[in-house]
């Protein structure tokens, strides 16, 4: 599962909103497929510009991500690096493109079900559900850190108090 962070949550939410509001969608088009919509949000490139960059590599986003090399500055590699900076791994990119992350599917409203990668409504619900799941994970991490910090502070104070007696 992707690393929970505000940037990724916002990208998923904005991409879902764009799709809901009628943005062009075509699963077979690098610039207007699932990852293409995330890239439109984070890069501010349009679908045509993303397609031009993506055509410097071969395959779908899944293959491009697997072959990604951070050293080259090929246009497709720059796009994959944007996705990785959001907290996505090649597996996450594959799951976004194919709507296959089991954690997201189990978190769907109404429970687990398979979604179709090329159905706009399925992409919207997947993006929104993934954003909600990441938001919950991020919230849990923040609460856990605060709790650990509080417990550490309390134990430090108790130790200091014990030395006085």
PLM segments and residue spans:
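Cysteine-nucleophile amide-bond enzymes
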Residues: 1-29, 33-36, 40-165
């Amino acid at each position: 599962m992707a690393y929970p962070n505000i940037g990724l949550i916002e990208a998923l939410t904005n991409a879902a909103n764009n799709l809901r509001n009628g943005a062009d969608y075509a699963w077979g088009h690098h610039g207007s497929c699932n990852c293409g919509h995330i890239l439109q949000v984070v890069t501010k490139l349009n679908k045509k510009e993303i397609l031009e960059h993506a055509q410097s590599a071969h395959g779908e986003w899944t293959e491009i991500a697997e072959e990604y090399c951070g050293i080259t500055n090929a246009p497709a590699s720059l796009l994959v690096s944007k996705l990785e900076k959001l907290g996505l791994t090649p597996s996450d990119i594959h799951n976004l493109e194919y709507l296959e992350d089991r954690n997201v599917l189990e978190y769907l409203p109404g429970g687990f079900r398979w979604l179709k990668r090329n159905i706009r409504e399925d992409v919207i619900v997947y993006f929104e559900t993934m954003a909600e799941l990441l938001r919950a994970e991020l919230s849990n991490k923040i609460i856990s850190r605060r709790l650990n910090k509080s417990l550490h502070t309390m134990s430090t104070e108790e130790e200091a108090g014990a030395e006085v007696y």
